[in-house]
Amino acid sequence: MLFGISIENRKSAETMASAVTMPSSDGIPSIDGMKKVAITFDDGPNPDYTEMLLAGLKERGVKATFFLLGKEVEKYPDIVADIYAEGHLIGTHSYEHVNLKNLSDTAAIEQVDKTNAAIHEITGEYPEYIRPPFGCWKCNLDYETKMIEVLWDVDPLDWKTSNSDVIAKRVVDKVGENDIILLHDASESSVKAAFKIIDELQREGYTFVTVEEILFD
């Protein structure tokens, strides 16, 4: 869903939704010749693992996209400031990780607005992108929030296993050009898997970009 326009390019997966908001290039090289891929992290900031992740991303020269929970933003503003200072893209993931479709429009908008306000308080910018929990968005909110919904192409279900090798293999085996990878920064195994994914895909010639560059470049 992009500015209220449905793009019928949704891919099925084991989770409630597994799709991206823009069509895939199906392996066709981009105009600038780069093989692009975006790595994204949900549910942060996490006091134990986000800084570890940021250090590894910086070491590898990678820019990522973080979809943050408002309640965690309020608890760990310094980590949010670090994410922003490192040049990563920050999006909204709701305030309390609730299924927005189960809420009234007013309550759903509050989940978004409270998170956006918390992020703005730290970064001075309001997020433009939202990844709704479970991939469940209320389409009529497109006109209320003016945010761009971003889902995903590859979901290794990293929250179901503590084996970083398994997580990494699930991604590397499936990922393609212009795909958006879904991970979380709430466990050591997910962070280690992210590093393994990045290292392997960089060896394969991929360049990591933010979701904004996937959607609009």
Regions found by a protein language model. Name each.
Residues E8-R10, E14, V20-P23, P133-K146:
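Short, compositionally biased "basic patch" segments
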Residues M1-I5:
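Hydrophobic membrane-insertion alpha-helices, especially the h-region
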Residues S6-E8, D199:
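Residues marking helix boundaries in flexible regions
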Residues E14-Q111, A118, E125-Y126, I198, ...:
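Active-site beta->alpha N-cap acidic-glycine motif
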Residues V98-T207, E212-D217:
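Catalytic domains of cell-wall/extracellular-matrix polysaccharide-remodeling enzymes
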